[in-house]
């Protein structure tokens, strides 16, 4: 999933979409064109430096793959794992000392895939 996410990022797609697209491809889910359009509004911490939108893409993927209850549990697990490494969930704080978010996107893809595989 990481390689696909980074591939789409290199092609210019935003953080939320690259995680969602890579995950739906890996797990055989048809993603409607409208999903890309909806993700256009979900980038750069919702435009105000808020929550990392790659995390949002992962949460959307959990919602497609699992029940509501399970998706919420996986969401919290992902947030804890991510926060342990980056000490924040905020786009502004995470990106402040980086030129780009390639490492962050890669890590989110890995964590997301690990959580999905453990809970299939």
Regions found by a protein language model. Give the residues of each.
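Acidic-glycine-rich active-site phosphate/pyrophosphate-binding loop
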Residues: 20-39, 83-88
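Phosphate-handling active-site elements
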Residues: 27-37, 63-77
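Short cysteine clusters
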Residues: 15, 52, 91
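Glycine/serine-rich anion-binding loops at beta->alpha junctions
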Residues: 44-62
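Active-site-proximal helix-loop elements at catalytic-domain edges
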Residues: 1-27
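Buried hydrophobic packing segments
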Residues: 19-23, 57-64, 108, 112
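A short glycine/serine-rich beta->alpha loop
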Residues: 3-10, 41-50, 94-98
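C-terminal binding/interaction regions
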Residues: 74-120
